[in-house]
A protein has these predicted regions:
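Soluble, non-membrane globular domain cores that form compact, hydrophobic packing
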Residues: 2-167, 172-373
Length: 373
């Protein structure tokens, strides 16, 4: 079981206590800059040491989705947004098998090597993975779904992938709509639990909204996905329609409207944890104005990048690889080579006009040495 948050009394269900801290507080507490390489390659879970190689199959057996030449399956859920787009995508099957213990046991005093924090291919992806993981325990707890990732202990529904954007959270997998309905519509068992009721339907998904009117909150439930919107600043139903429409092919997708984004996804979007942005350039005034961004690529070397996709893939119990793709106005190849994948080995950085690609590898031995320095 994960440790209690600081300054909180011991409680067996501390994730579900009413005065739960903000996502930012918890990210800081769990060490948001702890890298996936550190989480996975140091003290890897026993599950990761099975004979079966983790992450070797791109086919998702749980929900039947398969990455195609047109892009990874999660990309179908990313609608064309006239503003900007940020996302975090997690192959939960792989991450759960490999690093679930490390995700839960991360401590605030974990020493993270400075070179990891300074590497755009490591820190942002790691923060994204933790954000997606913690969203379920934090944000979904208010709907009675806070333990959805707990390996069948509380739910018959199973999770294969997680997708987070600033407006929405998508749980992909084998979902039992009746089970979710029972949780959402149940009489609240605690003060902080919000009761919902079925009020609408969108393209085969049953839509639930709070019994007590709350702007910006709606949950769509289907047998292959659970789509959550909980942001009072948006029209929740419109957001659901846009995202479900993209997934069903009845609304425009970001990948279809942007050649640079499609290229970046094809190049670097196939990892076990993937983050990306399309829109406000990294380091721009528009990006700086948003102090709570989902994806943080605020590195001087990436200033002016309008499209970025970065991913980490778990190859086995000892090795992770990273892939990076960006479209940057007037990129500085020397400066980029100093940071992209610099904390790993087998580093490669290539600049072709405005297109930048990079790859690197992180091995258990290298990570262990870095943490001792």
């Amino acid at each position: 079981m994960a440790p209690n948050p600081p300054d909180r009394p011991p409680h067996s269900n501390w994730r579900d206590l009413p005065n739960w801290p903000t996502r930012r507080t918890v990210l800081e507490y769990t060490g948001a800059t702890a890298t996936l390489a550190t989480l996975g390659l140091l003290g890897g879970s026993a599950a990761a040491q099975d004979d079966d190689e983790v992450g070797a199959d791109d086919t998702d057996e749980d929900d039947g989705e398969t990455a195609t030449d047109d892009g990874p399956a999660y990309s179908y859920w990313l609608p064309d947004d006239p503003r900007e787009l940020e996302f975090v995508a997690v192959d939960w099957v792989t991450l759960n098998e490999y690093a679930s213990d490390e995700l839960e046991d991360a401590q605030p005093d974990d020493d993270v090597p400075a070179e990891f924090e300074a590497d755009p291919m490591i820190a942002p992806v790691s923060e994204g993975a933790l954000s997606a993981y913690l969203f379920v325990g934090l944000d979904l707890a208010q709907f009675g779904l806070g333990r959805l990732l707990d390996d069948g202990e509380m739910f018959d529904s199973t999770v294969s992938e997680l997708l987070q954007t600033p407006d929405t959270y998508v749980v992909l997998g084998d979902i039992d709509p009746a089970e979710i309905d029972e949780r959402l519509t149940a009489e609240p068992a605690a003060e902080f639990i919000r009761q919902l009721e079925q009020t609408d339907e969108i393209d085969g998904y049953e839509v639930y909204t709070p019994v007590e009117d709350a702007a910006g909150t709606a949950i769509a439930v289907g047998d292959d996905a659970l789509v959550v919107v909980d942001d009072e600043a948006v029209d929740a139903l419109a957001v659901l329609e846009s995202m479900i429409g993209a997934a069903r092919g009845t609304a425009d997708r970001a990948v279809d409207d942007s050649e640079s984004f499609a290229w970046a996804l094809e190049t670097a979007g196939g990892g076990d944890v993937v983050i990306g942005q399309l829109g406000a350039p990294a380091g721009s005034a528009a990006a700086a104005d948003d102090g709570d961004r989902l994806v943080d690529f605020a590195y001087p070397e990436l200033e002016g990048a309008e499209t970025i996709v970065s991913s980490l893939t778990i190859e086995d119990e000892e090795t992770s690889t990273g892939n990076f793709a960006a479209v940057i106005d007037d990129p500085d190849e020397t400066a980029l080579a100093d940071v992209l994948g610099a904390s790993g080995t087998d580093q490669s950085v290539d600049v072709d006009g405005s297109r930048v690609t990079a790859t690197a590898t992180w091995d258990e031995e290298d990570v262990a040495v870095a943490r001792k320095m």
